[in-house]
Amino acid sequence: KVRRSGLTMPVVTPRFVDNAWRRGCDFVVLDLEDSVPRNLKDHARTLIKDAIPNVSKGGTEAFTRINHELMEADTAAVVWPGLKRIKYPKTETADEVRALDALITRYEKERGMELGSIEIDTGIETALAITNVYDIASASPRVKELSATNGGYDMSRDLGVEMFVPYDQFVYLKGEAELAARALGLAVRTAPFVANTTGSVSDADRALRQAKAARACGIYLGGGGLNPAVVDSHNKGYTPSTDDVRDAHWVLAQFERLQTTDEPWTEVEGRFIDRYEAERARGVL
């Protein structure tokens, strides 16, 4: 699945939802959590079912983010055909993931949906979540990817640190989460540090630099942006360049020639070619 770019938007704002599929992003997160005021939570739940096919036009995937403390009510409202993923924020234990899995399964059965069709995305946003991250990531087969925290407001508040600073105060946390994901064979969504001292969510240049840096680190999944201005940057940054694609085809061609010999590796034009380099090239393509 190609998931380079996304937009998170309040489901209670019709103009955002109606235009989401035109933004060019690979997925849209219909938000019930932070962007929806407490007094509109009940109303927001009534909008999800119709919003799913609306944002899915043109092949965009529909995700939703529910409220941690309102798991049962929110899950009942969002499990409908066409939804691809539920983002569960502030996940802290494996038991929470298993409880969410059971709820999703219940409604998939009741509504005649394919069992297991909806993924779970766990929000690793607290110190406790980091200590439990391996158990969280392995708690359900619905967890296909792990969002290795980039910090954010919740993690900053939990740790008591400043968020918009010129250094990476979350490097250890991201590393712990990424190692757990790699050990489990899960795809990883995170990014190397690129300073954002102003808190801007619409800096297209910074978004491009961060996406390119992430791809160079073997991270091919983009995040859910908050402003349409960063969508194109994420699409470009997470997409291999023409030169990258050409090089990958060349590497595979050399590897195919190597397969006709008894040698485990070869050197062509100063490049070392073996099965590991071939695997890297396949990943690019």
Feature-to-residue mapping (PLM):
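Expand to "…catalyze enediolate/carbanion chemistry for C-C bond making/breaking, isomerization
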Residues: K1-L285
